[in-house]
Regions:
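Solvent-exposed, non-transmembrane regions of integral membrane proteins
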Residues: 4-342
């Protein structure tokens, strides 16, 4: 997962840099380098997953010979591309000039934050291999490291994104461009304060996620509506470039994702316990009872299934049937969660 995330981050950088090249004819060398790195990290992710150098449930079809073949391809492609880039990068002269306060600068800041975060992800992924190879130590880098190292860059990115989206190209006045965002900023702060007041516990993660989500989504909406002018009509909406809609949906999706991650981290509840057959326990306003544990034979698997009755105020709501499956041919156990959406 982490190896593919690093490649995805470089692809996002490449997309933003390509926009600058298209609009302003600058950052040409940087864009070519990002294209090389994005492809290279895709190969690195393939090598990690296929070669078996890392032990993980996500590593499949392990084959050291295939891994060596991928490593050779990686060396040839990346070595050749970076060598050619080092000799020819000076020929890609940038024509566009921009000031320190402009949309170009905001996109460069976005690239820097994403580049550092991608390096952090790659470092955390590859460090157990380095530690075992050179220091003979077995290490495991888990979620605490990635959360602590990755989160600050994502918060900075979320703060910059609406401001950068509303800046004009080439040259901008930060005060004039930010005036229209003041109301959005205040409203986002108020929403975060409301969540802080009504939440159980005093975790900052949830309110910060609400603030960033509201700030990004509403700031992106403001950028879209500002292109429509004062008279918002269906006709003007239809003639807007598709790139504006693409930016709106992509940035709004990022804001919603930040909120969802923060909400899950802050407000999820996990209850691990041993329950005998016929035993019951309570979670919030719900009462759960383990009615039975059954052995089930499927078309290509054997399963141990729990039958759990869920009730509220003495009334049965639903029956959940989570399973622990084992596939004899693949020798692969899986967990099938039981989810009720009401």
């Amino acid at each position: 997962q982490q190896s593919s995330a690093a490649s995805d981050v470089y692809k996002r950088q490449l997309l933003h840099s390509a926009i600058v090249v298209e609009k302003r004819e600058t950052l040409k060398s940087w864009t070519i380098l990002l294209a090389i790195l994005a492809f290279g990290f895709s190969l690195i992710g393939t090598f990690i997953v296929r070669s078996g150098v890392l032990t993980s449930v996500h590593a499949f079809a392990n084959d050291p010979e295939r891994g060596m073949f991928i490593l050779i391809i990686l060396g040839i492609f990346m070595g050749g591309a970076l060598t050619l880039f080092s000799f020819r990068s000076s020929a890609m002269e940038a024509r566009g000039v921009f000031s320190m306060v402009s949309r170009e600068t905001a996109l460069v800041s976005n690239n820097v934050l994403l580049a550092v975060s991608a390096f952090v992800v790659f470092f955390g992924t590859i460090w157990p291999l380095v530690a075992e190879l050179f220091f003979d130590r077995k290490l495991s880098v888990g979620p605490p490291f990635f959360n602590a190292a990755f989160t600050p860059f994502m918060i900075l990115l979320g703060l910059i994104l609406p401001v950068g989206s509303n800046l004009p190209w080439k040259r901008a006045n930060i005060l004039n461009s930010s005036k229209k965002l003041i109301f959005v900023f205040i409203l986002s702060i108020c929403l975060a304060g409301l969540i802080w007041a009504i939440q159980t516990g005093k975790s900052l993660i949830g309110p910060v996620g609400v603030f960033l989500g509201a700030w990004i989504v509403m700031g992106t909406m403001l950028d879209l509506f500002s292109k429509l002018g004062r008279s918002i009509s269906l006709k003007r909406l239809i003639v807007l470039p598709r790139a504006d809609f693409g930016k709106f949906f992509a940035h709004s999706g990022l804001g919603i994702t930040m909120f969802a991650i923060a909400a899950l981290t802050s407000w999820e509840k996990e209850d691990i316990r041993v329950v005998p057959v016929g035993g019951s326990w309570k979670i919030a306003a719900y009462e759960l009872k383990l009615n039975s544990v059954e052995n089930v034979r499927g078309p290509n698997y054997f399963s141990t299934m729990g039958v759990i009755a869920v009730s509220k105020d003495g009334q049965l709501l639903t029956v959940l049937r989570p399973e622990k499956r084992n596939y004899p041919v693949a020798q692969m156990p899986t967990t099938e969660a039981a989810i009720d959406y009401r």
